[in-house]
Structures are given as C-alpha cells and as structure tokens.
Amino acid sequence: MRIIPRTMSTQHPDNAKVPEWAKSEVIEGEDEVKEAFLAYSMYGVHEVMWDAEGKDVDTHVVRKLLSNYPDYFREHILGKDVFLTYRLPNPKVEGADRKVFAETMESIPITYDLAEKFYGNGITVPVFEVILPMTTSNLEIISVARYYEKAVANEDELELYDGVKVKDLVGEIYPKVIEVIPLVEDRDSLQNIDNIVEGYYKVIKPKYMRVFLARSDPAMNYGMITAVLSVKIALSELYKLSESLNFEIYPIIGVGSLPFRGHLSPENYEKVLEEYKGVYTYTIQSAFKYDYDYDKVKSAISSINNSRIGPAKILEKYEEDVLRKITILYTERYQPIIENLANAINDVSVLLPRRRARKLHIGLFGYSRSAGKVSLPRAISFVGSLYSIGIPPELIGISSLSNLDEKEWDIFKQNYVNFKHDLQTAARFFNWESFELIKDIWKISEDTIAKIKEDIDYAESVIGIKLGGIDYDSRKHILMSSLFLLSFKEKILQESKKYLYEMALIRRSLG
C-alpha cells in the first residue's frame, strides 16, 4: 500500500510576508518549482499540489525538480516517498481553460518517461493523481478518469497510416490509468458526498479513494458555520460509505490560517486535528509556511505528520438533520448581508497585495466566486477585505443560532468543538468605528448595519465573546483599520495599501 500523505503544500496566495528566496512579491514561474522542492526538503511536507486552475501552469515541473535537485530526489522517490498532485481546471465550469485541462493531462505520460530515465524502469509513477475542483457529480470525475484512459493513455494504439501506430512514433504511453480526487466545494455536494463517491466507485472500481473537502470557499459562499457543519456531515457520510462498501476512503481538508478559512496555523494545529477527526491530509497553505517563525512551522508540520488519525464522528440521522437545518438557517442570515457588503469587499480586494500570478480575480468570467446574486473575489481576498474594514466574516450570521432549541444547541456544540475559540480569535479584530465609516463610504444600508449589530450583540451577550482589541496586536489592527477606511475615503490609495499590508502582517495572513 502506498503512503497516504498527512500534509499537502499548496500555492494559495494567503501569505502576508514574501519568503526570502522569492525573486519578487508575486511568486511565479521558476520560484514555484523551487517552492515545491523546499516544501519537501525544508518543511518536511509529504505532498505538493501543483495548481493548473485559474493560472498559467508549468507542466515541466517534474523535469525541473529532477534535474535541479537530483540528490534529493534520488533519496526521496517522487511518487513513492513524496508526492506531486496536479490540480486541474474543471472543464465543465472553466470553459476558457478546457484546453489547459487537456494539456495538463497530456503532460502526465511525459513525467512517467522522465522518471523512468531518472530512476530506472518501473521504479515509480511520479504523477498518478489529479484533483478536480468544483466537483458536483460522480459523472464529472468518471469523465476525467475515462478521458485519461481513452484520450491520453490509449492513443498509443491509434493507427496513423498503413499499419504504423502512434506508439511506433512516440513510444508506449504510461501510466494507463490515473486516480481522480474530487474537490467538493458547495454545500449541497458536501452534504451529499456519498452519491459522488459511490457512483465513481461503482464504475471505476478503484482500490481506495482520496476525497478533498473544501473549507474555505463554502465559508465564503454560505458562512463559516455552514462550512464547518457541511464538512462534518461529509466526513460522517464518507466513513459510513467506507464501512458499507468495505473500501478505504482518505479525506483531505483544505484549510487556511484564519478561523474563517479553517484556522490551521502553527499556533492552532492541535485544535484543528481535534476538530476534524477522520481527516488524513491537511493543506499547508502559504501563510502557514511564510508568516510564522520557520522553526515553529517545521515543528508543527512534523507534529501533524506524526499525529494519530482518529475515526470521524459518525452522525445519527437526527443529528445530521439538525446540522443540515442549522446550515440552511445560517446561510439565509449570512448571504443577504454579504450581498450588501459586496461593493466594499470588491473595492478593498483589488488593493490587497498580490502574492501569485493568478488570472481573473473578479467578474462573472472565469474565476468569480458567487454568493447569492453578487460576484465576489477569491476567498483569500474576500476574507482579507472584511478583516481590513474591521468586520471579521466569522461574526456575520451568528445570530441565526438564536433559533435553536436547547437540544439543537447541544448537537451544534458537540459537532463544532472549537466554535467559541474560533469566534474569539476573530472577534479581537472587530472595529466599532467601522459602521459609520462604511456607511459613509459605500452607503451601506441601515438595515444591513442593524443586522451585523444583532450578530455582534448575540456573540457578546449569548456566546460570551469579547469584541475588539484585547492586546497590542489587535488594538494596532483596529487602529489601522480605521486609518485604512479614512485614507480610502480620501482616495489616498498608496496609504490605503500600506495599511492593508500592515494589518495582514499582524494577522499573519492576507485572508
């Protein structure tokens, strides 16, 4: 049996600090190849996700890794000891990137040939897994697996002319199959994940399956509590399915440093391991790696790698029904507020520092993320914008919990163990001055302000959260938030950008 990675380094652009080895503030090109090597060698991460989604991808990454760092990769075999996993664009969703999907798939046999030359015949398959984002049905992942088998691996048998086959020209094509990891990002698909996985299992018959649960995008689209509870439902469903099919399923969770995006940081990883029992692989995003002291980061990654994997909490039907009800109530409260803050979020997001060469951050084309009726930036910019205007998104929608009875509240607390801790961590950055300033700058309605105030009041009076600065860093952040809003109002944008960067350094994450 292969090693199932415990940690997966990603290229999420959530870091405030720029690593010393980067040639510029935007990490791209050769720097991303170097970053992959450093993730393995310096940080001890088991797996690197190589992202072809929403950006220009370098499909020669394996060639560059093996030729630039031969000593390391002779000792640590790519595909056996450490892993490289492609994240594809979803051709159903990202129409402009359909051919990037094809190009990335076509590059997999090239990596096989390179590894054969480097390691010897039959030693390893360096890239054998791909991640499909925004998966909503089993048909999508079945199509990806079959596309590779039929359109890539089997093309070596095509006859070109007069008995001459493709393999006579370019050699035989390996590997013959690839493993597809669905990345599930929307609420309904997370809560019905068993249908996606079981459908794939019945057709493809894999020996095991890795399933990637998003935690960041569902938080942006439906609210933090909806995201957490949807992941808990998904983990329970996957473990039930694993037992009923007698088939191993290894969940991955996509988590960032701030509470809204998962709260996996070098300072909070133990609580996240406790929160998401049953998860095999945790994403190590850029803020985790670059916004904390290196020794602390390396130690945290080592601890995650060596931690025990506990079984997921299996939910009874009545518990699952309660959690589903909470996610609906929460989303109904959360989304209208976000829709009314969308102009503010979009205006601030374009001023945040850029850390990766990502295409199309906003708009209906390509990479817009939509919550209800409006277009929003990507999740990192979304979170960074709300923190920067002094309204951490973790607080939005909280008062919907007032609709729960005592039994429902108990079920909620049992299934979101670190709820109060996550909320308190975020609430330190709440700025009371924001209301007047955002009303003035973006003409935010009295009704929206009143709803946020209800959420704030509920967090304070019912949950017992202390809002606002309680230490030097949080007080400084609140001050910077007011200065940012004032400079933005006066259109002194260079100063606005400076304050945004300073706040990100304090949070140890852009968003």
From Swiss-Prot:
The text of the family note is: Belongs to the PEPCase type 2 family.
Q: Does the keyword Magnesium apply?
A: yes
- Gene Ontology MF term list: magnesium ion binding; phosphoenolpyruvate carboxylase activity
What gene does this protein come from? ppcA
The cofactors it requires, by name, are: Mg(2+)
Q: Which domain of life is it from?
A: Archaea
SUPFAM superfamilies in the record, alphabetically?
Phosphoenolpyruvate/pyruvate domain
Known partners and oligomeric status: Homotetramer.
Recall the taxonomic lineage recorded for the source organism.
Archaea, Thermoproteota, Thermoprotei, Sulfolobales, Sulfolobaceae
The record's EC number reads 4.1.1.31
Reply yes or no: does the keyword Nucleotide-binding apply: no
Q: Which GO terms describe its biological process?
A: carbon fixation; oxaloacetate metabolic process; tricarboxylic acid cycle
Question: What is the protein named?
Answer: Phosphoenolpyruvate carboxylase
Catalysed reaction, written as an equation: oxaloacetate + phosphate = phosphoenolpyruvate + hydrogencarbonate
Q: What does this protein do?
A: Catalyzes the irreversible beta-carboxylation of phosphoenolpyruvate (PEP) to form oxaloacetate (OAA), a four-carbon dicarboxylic acid source for the tricarboxylic acid cycle.
Matching entries from Pfam families are given as: PEPcase_2
EC class of the enzyme, as a word: lyase
